Amino acid sequence: MPELPEVEVSRMGISPHLVGETIKTLTFRTPKLRWDIPQELKRLEGQVIRSISRRAKYLLIETDTGTAIVHLGMSGSLRVLDADFPPAKHDHVDLKLTNGKILRYNDPRRFGAWLWSAPDEIHTVLLGSGPEPLTDDFNADYIAEKAEKRKVAVKQFIMDNKVVVGVGNIYANEALFSSRINPLRSASKVTKQEWLLLTKEIKQVLATAIRQGGTTLKDFAQADGKPGYFAQELQVYGKAGEQCPNCAELIQELKIGQRNTFYCSSCQV
């Protein structure tokens, strides 16, 4: 599933080709992805793309008349192609530009979304979201205060979008391992010093993943079709039964909040 780094890599890949260009047409080959595709998106036709930003795992394609909000879901990807490039199976949305290029959205599982937001409106999917993890607003003071009296497992806590957005399963596993914090520990039991380290490691692992083009485990591809290379850097995610890179113990696997969790019971306390 594309997480924050993969979405940011997609934004960086498509932005140079789209920002400042005019939308000619929008083509929908399915009426519904995760949710119905709103026909208001047609209002973007004839509009200049002013910017492409990211909030949490959503991409915001902004024009003067409104914003297309794109979520990649479980298997979505975006590519910039020549307009005459024939659509393939699972190519559900084409945003055609007047310069002869198209932004094509592919999603085999159809669990992503294309949504509409009017100018100066905050869509309901973005309401109540926590701070971005790569900003100064996400820091040890902030998260330690949020964690007070929270008995939920620390891994589940840092994956809560109301606490901080975009810390997905892969990167939560990796950051907790780097911080030597057991993912089962209650959030309220994490010390201030450990929060200092964990917030630093979350920022570090996300920034590194972005630099390496994200993580391709199955479906994700960058805007140019290339895979993300951070999978080669994974320390514990998907490595159950293998030796811990820091000691001789085997990596354990269990589920926390219905998400696969990988950790070293010796290194992480």
From Swiss-Prot:
Active site location: 2 (schiff-base intermediate with dna), 3 (proton donor), 57 (proton donor), 259 (proton donor)
Keywords: DNA damage, DNA repair, DNA-binding, Glycosidase, Hydrolase, Lyase, Metal-binding, Multifunctional enzyme, Zinc, Zinc-finger
A GO BP annotation: base-excision repair
Pfam families named in the record: Fapy_DNA_glyco, H2TH, zf-FPG_IleRS
Cofactor note: Binds 1 zinc ion per subunit.
Binding site for DNA: 90, 109, 150
Cofactor dependence: Zn(2+)
Record note on quaternary structure: Monomer.
Function: Involved in base excision repair of DNA damaged by oxidation or by mutagenic agents. Acts as a DNA glycosylase that recognizes and removes damaged bases. Has a preference for oxidized purines, such as 7,8-dihydro-8-oxoguanine (8-oxoG). Has AP (apurinic/apyrimidinic) lyase activity and introduces nicks in the DNA strand. Cleaves the DNA backbone by beta-delta elimination to generate a single-strand break at the site of the removed base with both 3'- and 5'-phosphates.
PANTHER family on file: FORMAMIDOPYRIMIDINE-DNA GLYCOSYLASE (PTHR22993:SF9)
Protein name as annotated: Formamidopyrimidine-DNA glycosylase
Name of the gene encoding the protein in the UniProt record: mutM
